Structures are given as C-alpha cells and as structure tokens.
Amino acid sequence: MKPIRKDNEIEWWNFDKCHDGIGTVNCKSLLDGCDSMKFCFMHCDDMKAGVSIGVHEHSNTEEIYYLVSGKGILTYDGIEYEMLPGDVSLCNMGHSHGFLATEDSILVVVG
C-alpha cells in the first residue's frame, strides 16, 4: 500500500441498513488492511439526518467513532449520549454501540 491515499482516488459506496440500522450510510473506505495492520479499517460515513448505524456488539474487536460534523446520538451499552463535532467514542471489546444522525453528519469510524 502507498504511504498516502488521495481523496479523489477513493470511491464512495452505499451501506444499506448498516448493522440493522435505518437508511443508507454513504461510506468511503479510507484504509482497509485486516491482514497487515493492527486495525482492520478506517472509513468516513456521510449520514443524512435520521440515518443510523444499528446497535451492535464488539465481542473481540474495538471500534472508534469520531464525529467530524453534524450532530447525533451515540448509544453505548444501552445508554444514549449526545455527540457533537470533535467528540470521540471508543467501544471496547465486550460492549455495544450504535449511532443515529440527528443532523446531516460526517462520522469517521476506525476498527
């Protein structure tokens, strides 16, 4: 893999009902390297208001959500938290999380 990926070289793709969520998440895979890196992926999610990543458990992986823009509700182990731009959340192994965009949002996900 090259040491840099240019934004204009990365294609967007649609993820319908992500983790049984609502609507379609428009995704851009920034990094993908399960075989060669300690983490498996990094992607940018463009989510319209009302679109969600369904609540799901991380039994043997961890995942980070970083909200670039917009506003949303993070559900972590059944408790809801407001997320604003610049907020970050780590879902540790054995825990569950999901995200609902309450405004048009850009969410970066690393796992």
Question: Where on the chain are the PLM-derived regions?
Answer:
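Ligand-binding loop in jelly-roll beta-barrel domains
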Residues: 36, 93-111
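A short, compositionally biased micro-patch
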Residues: 48, 60, 67, 92-94, ...
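Conserved short histidine dyad/triad with adjacent acidic residue
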Residues: 29, 41-59
